[in-house]
């Protein structure tokens, strides 16, 4: 029987330290050594999943292949280790309690008093162990900060792990902040010392300290942290601010993290194969070209709401030796009559080589998105629409090309005369919000000779989805008769999955979320095409 190894990553001092990037980077280093790696994100909130959470609260909702609506860190994991994860790889307090209470109602606890310890903690451990089956190493990131009340059951569960599977099979890594006090000109270790003290009071002694810092860590500071936090000096790892998140694995490898982890877990330390990763990072850091894509969205105040889109643009940019700048344009700014003047100014200032309209929900800012699409279509600016972005493209085309004045989606206007976008038939009897959309990977059949077919290079494609509305099949014919090509449909021919306008040099949209499948070594074709078209290339 294969011995499973578990690595638990906690965070201290403040949130948003980069635990997710640290975990993903370690996953990359271990996979580069030939190990089979799985990754888990624990979120100590009471929701079952992230699906009902506002982008302003939680950033984007990352959709897995099997339809899980999960934390955005799963996106980092997938991109860094180049593996598809599942909905089960995101554990929440809600999922754990739901499972325990369901078992209690079934009488599975045989009359025992159901308590946090042992029932909740056992459920957490069982979930992690089950996900670890078949893997050499499972990396588990504990969301939140040590000291948070809501994290305590998870911390207790991972404390017990070393007794359950043997301490030689468990590694604890603590990510903490070393703040730099400019007035004093020095890094301060006290917050990290107190964070480790808090962790040790729970019964967890970290094996490795990863210190987030904007300045180099001196030997003196390493020795001090090693002494007060009871770790080896070599286990104090510097994690300085990087030029790109994709440089972090290389920086941590230079610090000796990969070698240290394999040593502490009694695993063979093989030479990591990071050549392709280094080439990718070099292209990101040293581009030869530059373009600016305008992202017209509703949630642009919080860039994490579109995280996978920005990463997909980085991947496509690197493939084309191009730095992709993003011009964040709030869609509500384009709802005035002067929207064309604003977009004209962006073009004159070289701030609008291409336009991307991402997904979203609700009618706020929708007319601004429609105006941006009209501008892209009429001025032949490379355009990519995603999910709601495709629906808005259909509305714009129906109004301004087909002559269907007032055409709309029933999401925005239930009484529209021309419902060119309508609720999916299977959604019409559903009232619950959580986990009820059309979620996960679905196939589409592409029409040969179209732009979509040229970009993908094959007839059948699978993309991830997250939507309730579709292009109304009753309007397919009139749209196509006026020059809109429905270049990809569901296998039954009912649902429009891709649309394009062939007379424009690059005008394409999809009902799916292609950004979730883009990887550093495999940029998504739609984003690659957008960057190439924005550079002036004709897509052949």
UniProtKB/Swiss-Prot annotation:
UniProtKB keywords: ATP-binding, Glutamine amidotransferase, Ligase, Magnesium, Metal-binding, Nucleotide-binding, Pyrimidine biosynthesis
Any one Gene Ontology BP term: 'de novo' CTP biosynthetic process
Domain of life: Archaea
Reactions the enzyme catalyzes: UTP + L-glutamine + ATP + H2O = CTP + L-glutamate + ADP + phosphate + 2 H(+); L-glutamine + H2O = L-glutamate + NH4(+); UTP + NH4(+) + ATP = CTP + ADP + phosphate + 2 H(+)
InterPro entries to which the protein is assigned, alphabetical: Class_I_gatase-like, CTP_synthase, CTP_synthase_N, GATASE, GATase1_CTP_Synthase, P-loop_NTPase
Top-tier EC class: ligase
Name listed for the protein in its UniProt record: CTP synthase
């Amino acid at each position: 029987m294969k011995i499973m190894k578990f690595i638990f990553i906690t965070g201290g001092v403040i949130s948003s330290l980069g635990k997710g990037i640290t975990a993903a980077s370690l996953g990359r280093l271990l996979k580069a050594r030939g190990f089979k790696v799985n990754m888990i994100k624990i979120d100590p909130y009471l929701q079952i999943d992230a699906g009902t959470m506002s982008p302003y609260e939680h950033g984007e909702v990352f959709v897995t292949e099997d339809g899980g609506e999960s934390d955005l860190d799963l996106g980092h994991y997938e991109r860094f280790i180049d593996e598809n994860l599942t909905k089960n790889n995101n554990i929440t307090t809600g999922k754990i309690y739901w499972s325990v209470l369901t078992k209690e109602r079934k009488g599975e606890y045989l009359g025992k008093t159901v308590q946090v310890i042992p029932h909740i903690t056992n459920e957490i451990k069982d979930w992690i162990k089950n996900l670890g089956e078949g893997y050499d190493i499972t990396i588990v990131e504990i969301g939140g900060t040590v000291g948070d009340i809501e994290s305590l059951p998870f911390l207790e569960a991972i404390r017990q792990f070393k007794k359950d599977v043997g301490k030689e099979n468990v590694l604890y890594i603590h990510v903490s902040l070393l703040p730099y006090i400019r007035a004093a000109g020095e890094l301060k270790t006290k917050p990290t010392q107190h964070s480790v003290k808090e962790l040790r009071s729970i019964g967890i002694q970290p094996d490795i300290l990863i210190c987030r810092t904007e300045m180099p860590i001196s030997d003196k500071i390493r020795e001090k942290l090693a002494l007060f936090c009871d770790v080896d000096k070599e286990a104090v790892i510097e994690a300085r601010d990087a030029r790109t998140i994709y440089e972090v694995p290389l920086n941590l490898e230079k610090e000796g993290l990969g070698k240290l982890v394999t040593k502490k877990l009694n695993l063979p330390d093989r030479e990591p194969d990071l050549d392709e990763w280094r080439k990718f990072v070099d292209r990101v850091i040293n581009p030869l070209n530059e373009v600016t894509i305008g992202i017209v969205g509703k949630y642009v105040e919080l860039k994490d709401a579109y995280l996978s889109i920005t990463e997909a643009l980085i991947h496509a940019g690197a493939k084309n030796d191009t730095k992709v700048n993003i011009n964040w344009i709030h869609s509500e700014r384009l709802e005035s009559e002067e929207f064309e003047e604003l977009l004209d100014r962006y073009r004159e200032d070289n701030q609008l080589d291409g336009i991307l309209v991402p997904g979203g929900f609700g009618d706020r800012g929708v007319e601004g998105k429609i105006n941006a699409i009209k501008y892209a279509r009429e001025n032949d600016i490379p355009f990519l629409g995603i999910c709601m972005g495709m629906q808005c493209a259909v509305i714009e085309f129906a109004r301004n090309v087909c002559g269907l004045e007032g055409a709309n989606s029933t999401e925005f206007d239930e009484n529209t005369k021309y419902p060119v976008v309508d609720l999916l038939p299977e959604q019409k009897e559903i009232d619950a919000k959580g986990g009820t959309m059309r979620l996960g990977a679905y196939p589409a059949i592409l029409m040969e000779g179209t732009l979509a077919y040229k970009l993908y290079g094959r007839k059948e494609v699978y993309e991830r989805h997250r939507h309730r509305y579709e292009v109304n099949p009753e309007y397919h014919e009139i749209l196509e008769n006026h020059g809109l090509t429905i270049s990809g449909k569901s296998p039954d021919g009912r649902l429009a999955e891709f649309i394009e306008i062939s007379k424009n040099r690059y005008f394409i949209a999809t009902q799916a979320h292609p950004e979730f499948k883009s990887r550093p070594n495999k940029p998504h074709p739609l984003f690659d095409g957008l960057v190439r078209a924005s550079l002036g290339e004709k897509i052949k």
